[in-house]
Amino acid sequence: MQPSTLQALTKRVLATQHVSNDDYCILERCGLWWHDAPITLYTDGEQILIKTPYYKEGIKLNTALVLAVKENNYDLIVLFTEWGANINYALLSVNKEYTRNLCRNLGAKEGLEASEVLRFFFETKRHKTSSNIILCHELFSNNPFLQNVNMVELRMIIYWELKDLITNLIVNENSFTEMLTKYWYGIAVKYNLKEAIQYFCQEYEHLNEWRLICALSFNNVFELHEICNTMNIDMNINKMMRLACMRDNNFLTIYYCFALGADINRAMYGSVSNFRIENMFFCMDLGADAFEESLELAERHGYSVIVDILSLKIYKANPILLAKETNPEKINTLLKNYYPKNMLAYDIYRIDNYL
């Protein structure tokens, strides 16, 4: 959408240009100023993003509008609308009657459909940066509009984004605010958004265990290492290993728990129980030898593939993994693109005997 006036077009062009510090006064006079800093506009594919030193990674134009409305910043409400922001989304954060009247004059309707609220939620959260995830938390976690949407749909969005977590606690939270706070915190850990993680860590100390669960579940060994070395962890190492093993190919956090002394046979047994075949092979690489118990478990569950695997007597530990390294950089280097040695042995056996 093109700006509706020549003045708006001029401002849009100016916002895309590099301006020296000496000329910031021009941007301020033109209204290209927010949070005591200049506004920069740029495009990423088909979407328009607004950047400021505070939002240095950029936020979407519609998101910037909602924030400007929340702050009752009339000049920016008008400017962002002229640049193409959907004025109807302003209803998500309007908190003053005169701001509401301004939005009406700019074409906002009287209310939003639940589907529109969900669409904005879905579109906004897709931008995975620290500043945007923090902003999403501030805009949505206590937003009464979001509480009026279809909770089943919202919980499904949350579930699929964090489906690798081993717990359904987040989608069963009684508190709407707590559910969304955990959601944004989980996103920050999943995508290793350092500034966002630090924000949630400082603001929500009671969610330290949730941070640990997310680090284990999302294979974030760097975050796990920091937690284990800076916080008092009230969780048994074998429970930590069980959480890490619930998602397949979680080699980094499984190895870290192994290095801290977790029972690798118990980890193998748990991997079999949850049909995590790659984790099972990796546990064998780490020296697990609970073959008989795991075979019996696989037979009880009817896991014919695992029964076939464990019926062979060809597996042994991989010596290069037994040093129990806890440096996350070294672990990441060691296991980057790692293919379990025992899985390779099984693949070769099948090729030799079935092809």
Curated annotation (Swiss-Prot):
GO terms for biological process: taxis. Pfam families: ASFV_360 (PF01671). Keywords: ANK repeat. ANK repeats lie at residues 60-92. InterPro entries: ASFV_MGF360. Belongs to the asfivirus MGF 360 family. Plays a role in virus cell tropism, and may be required for efficient virus replication in macrophages. This is Protein MGF 360-3L. It comes from African swine fever virus (isolate Tick/Malawi/Lil 20-1/1983).
